[in-house]
Structure formats: C-alpha cells, structure tokens
Amino acid sequence: MHIRSLELRDYRSWPELKVDLEPGITVFIGRNGFGKTNIVEAIGYLAHLSSHRVSSDAPLVRAHAENARVSAVAVNQGRELAAHLLIKPHAANQASLNRTKVRTPRELLGVVKTVLFAPEDLALVKGEPAERRRYLDDIIATRQPRMAGVKADYDKVLKQRNALLKTATIALRRGYGTEEGAAALSTLDTWDGQLARLGAEVMAARFALLNELGPKIYEAYTTIAPESRPAAVNYKTTIDQGLSQFSEFDAGIIEATLLTELAAKRQREIERGSSLVGPHRDDVDLMLGDQPAKGFASHGETWSFALSLRIAEFNLLKSDGTDPILILDDVFSELDAGRREKLVGIAQEVEQVLITAAVHDDLPENLKKVLTAQHTVTVQDTGTGRISLLDVQP
C-alpha cells in the first residue's frame, strides 16, 4: 500500500498542502515547530480517525478556520481509493470515499493503513493503561472496521451508566423499597446487560489480537535487544478471577462473567458513582523476564519495547496481505546506532515509508543512500499567524 497524493487544507499550520508521493522512502526535513509532523499526523488521522498527539479534534483545525480537510489517494495492489475527511471541531466529522459521501467516517477505516512510530510511543511502556488499550483498539479497528462501531457503542453505554451512577445515587441506595429506587435499579440492569454484551466483544477481540501479537512482540524484541531479557505481554482484566476457571473462553463466557462481576460490585459502584468493571479498566502487562517493563526497564529497554510493539503491529498487518505505510516521526535522533540500523533494515523492505527529521544529519548514512524523495518544510509569518510551506526557498 502507498499514498499517491495528499492534500491538506486548514490542518494545523497548513492552510494548504498538495504533495505527490511515491513508493519508497520519503523524508520531510524541517526544524521543530515548522509543521513536518502535522503532515504525517494527518495521514495517521485518516487511517485511525484519531491523532497520536492529542485526544480531541479542535487542535487539528487551523486558527480562525471553520474546519480542516484531509484528502488522500491510496493505492493498494493496483486499486486506487480516494478518501476525504472533513474535521469539524464542534460537530460531527464528515467523510467521502471516491467522491461519494459515506454515512460515518468509520467507513474510511482500512482504506489507509499506517503504522506510526514516534517519541510519544514511550508512553505505551511508561504511560497509563489507556495508552495500551488504545494501541490494541487501533489495530483491531484497522483489521476489523466493524469493531470501531462496537467500541464506540460501548463508550456511549459506559457514559450513560456512569451518569446514572452519579446522578441517581440516592435512589439506587434506597433500592426496591421506593418507586424511584426500583426505576433506577431497572435502568441500571438495562445498562449492565448492554455493557456486558458490548464489553465482551471488545475484550474477546483484544484477547484474540494479543494471542497473535505476543509471539511477534517477543521475536521483534529479541531481534532488537538480543542481550536483554525476553519480552512478553499479558492482557489483564477486571474479571481475571472469574475467567481463571475456564481453559478457553469466547465472547459468551466473557459476557456471563462480566454480568456476574457487575452484580458482585454493584454496591461498590453505587457508592463510588462509577463503573468498576469492564474493558475500560483493563490493561496490558508488558513484561521483561519476570518484571514489569513499567518501572523496571532501562531507558534503552523502554525504547526497544516501544519499537517492538510497532514492529509487531507492522508485521501482523503485513501478514494480513497488505504492507501498511510505515511512518517514522522524528525517531532517529532518539535511537542509538543499533536500533537505528534495525529500523533502517525494516524500512528498506516496506512499500512506502514516510520519515520526519529536524535536520538531514539526523538520518542514518545508510538511509540517506536509498531515499526516494526529500522535501523541506519551512514557515512564514502572516497576518493570521505562522503557516507551514513545502519546498519553498526562503
């Protein structure tokens, strides 16, 4: 897979950008803050419908603009698809595919497949569980776009359930002794059923993904850091104890176990005013030997583990039949010689690689020799603020 052309309008620092891209390795050179990462972020947004840098859409829209536009023509095994996304900071985003408006932007998932490695990926190892959950969910949505809808539905149910637990605390505590309490408990039962059904689908997909990813993460880490302890990953849930009695389990067993745990935790949830059971509280244990990587890994081991997660993701998507686009955002300056060499080896075998770097010297020498294209990102101050420019001589 590769992107043949990319267009941006009012995306962050880019009032307008039109660039033709080719298979091979393309690098964007520009000083920090000039807007080079905004280019690859936009491609990643088109692939995942989310940014690797911010959690909301508002920062993606250029100051004083009503919306941002991202358009790309992707080529996959000779077939071209034109994806277009309109990002609205205060309303629902809109999308079209081959100039035909689609019902929801989620229909774009899978059109562009990317794997992005950036300094922010250290948070996969050192950060909060939400980072690791998102890592899994993004891969699942790329491979099974329908699951993005399941996850979105789960999040809506969770929000409604939490709102009930917060606003109807007194009624819930009174229980069936009052009409108000009985109504609140009946509503909670309804949300429990939906939370368990949707949550079981999310969890089953995560379990299945980690079963495939685990060996690839182990292999990637062993290749990158052969002198280190072996890497392993385990999915940690809020219902581990309930699931431990089953040697194998599917979504049905997970759903039943969730319902059992929700019943057991109901009083605590009413007292706390929040949902304590479900995939929104799960985590992925990243292990080096018999120790968790978080808190025990050295800086070099943390980089190796983060890189291994992305390489495993890339290899998994590739095994599905399509080379995803590999995006390397300002990472070579952060890696030691050994890790740089491993990454260059991978990049040389990928259909399309997009790289950002602050200066040309940040690139490894063996990478400079195989570049397909190089672009320079500069900036210009205008009456409406600083804007980014591509290949414009000062």
Swiss-Prot record:
What is stated as this protein's family in its record?
Answer: Belongs to the RecF family.
Q: Which Pfam families match?
A: SMC_N
Q: Which UniProt keywords apply?
A: ATP-binding, Cytoplasm, DNA damage, DNA repair, DNA replication, DNA-binding, Nucleotide-binding, SOS response
According to its UniProt entry, the protein's GO biological process terms are:
DNA replication; DNA synthesis involved in DNA repair; double-strand break repair; SOS response
Q: Where does ATP bind?
A: 30-37
The answer to keyword DNA damage applying to this record is yes
Offer a single GO CC term for the protein: cytoplasm
Role according to the record: The RecF protein is involved in DNA metabolism; it is required for DNA replication and normal SOS inducibility. RecF binds preferentially to single-stranded, linear DNA. It also seems to bind ATP.
**Which cell locations does it reside in?**
Cytoplasm
Disulfide linkages recorded for this protein, renumbered to the chain, are none
Kindly indicate whether the keyword Lyase belongs to this entry. no
Q: Give any GO molecular function from the UniProt entry.
A: single-stranded DNA binding
**Name of the featured protein:** DNA replication and repair protein RecF
Native organism is Corynebacterium glutamicum (strain ATCC 13032 / DSM 20300 / JCM 1318 / BCRC 11384 / CCUG 27702 / LMG 3730 / NBRC 12168 / NCIMB 10025 / NRRL B-2784 / 534)
